[in-house]
Amino acid sequence: MILKNKRMLKIGICVGILGLSITSLEAFTGESLQVEAKEKTGQVKHKNQATHKEFSQLEKKFDARLGVYAIDTGTNQTISYRPNERFAFASTYKALAAGVLLQQNSIDSLNEVITYTKEDLVDYSPVTEKHVDTGMKLGEIAEAAVRSSDNTAGNILFNKIGGPKGYEKALRHMGDRITMSNRFETELNEAIPGDIRDTSTAKAIATNLKAFTVGNALPAEKRKILTEWMKGNATGDKLIRAGIPTDWVVGDKSGAGSYGTRNDIAVVWPPNSAPIIVLISSKDEKEAIYNDQLIAEATKVIVKGS
């Protein structure tokens, strides 16, 4: 999609120069461009309708509610489905909280050793549980939260940025008026339908992730640290990564919760581009089992539609 747009840009520039040089062709050129614009608008509309239908079919296939928001940062074109509906964000917050941590602290501060006790450990803490006696560097804790989805590391991140409300406040300063952050791990994963605590929308998360990874929310050196943590994610191989071409680079953060909640947020680098992809799915039954294949297949729809 990026390369096509670049070619169209070159064609448009050439046509514009030709119109300035040969005024006798002005009316013809203008009419041609108007027709071309209408045709392209129709093509985009048709493509959006097609992807919308495919997402709807995936919902039926997997008995799930799906939220999608993808931004092509080279063209600002988007693909979306239920972009403004709320979903429990689950562990995806860890990537954004790491971004807030980097925003509020110097790189040198990542070497600060943080100590914690056995009582601080919560369920699923595969990294922090090994270092109770010695503590861990702040940067190592952030990396454990993002790469391994370590829940105790996630709580320590929260504590370093003012708790869930401190996290929410930081996002408000970035323009996010949607995300609600209320609880620590592991309660934030309850994902009860209709409960707006610890929820956001696909569009809001995509906008925040774009700001942290390719935007100006962080200076370049800190952006690199965050994206390297995300590229090393060990929990997302069956999600967005499974739905893209093998020569694309992915940095992602997955999440899971009750009611069949399964999320994955990612920044994806195809050759010559850096689009942002956000997928969030949620089932309505508490005992529902999430299906990673839903995320992978939804990603394929995005790739095909881009």
From Swiss-Prot:
Organism in which the protein naturally occurs: Bacillus cereus
UniProt cross-references to Pfam families, sorted A to Z: Beta-lactamase2
Something else known: The class A beta-lactamase family has a specific amino-acid numbering system, sometimes called Ambler or ABL numbering and often misspelt as Amber. A multiple sequence alignment was used to derive a consensus sequence and then the consensus was numbered taking into account insertions and deletions. This allows use of identical numbers, e.g. for active site residues, despite differences in protein length. UniProt always uses natural numbering of residues, hence there appear to be differences in numbering between this entry and some papers.
Enzyme class label: hydrolase
UniProt keyword Hydrolase present: yes
Leader sequence residues: 1-27
Protein name: Beta-lactamase 1
Residues where substrate binds: 253-255
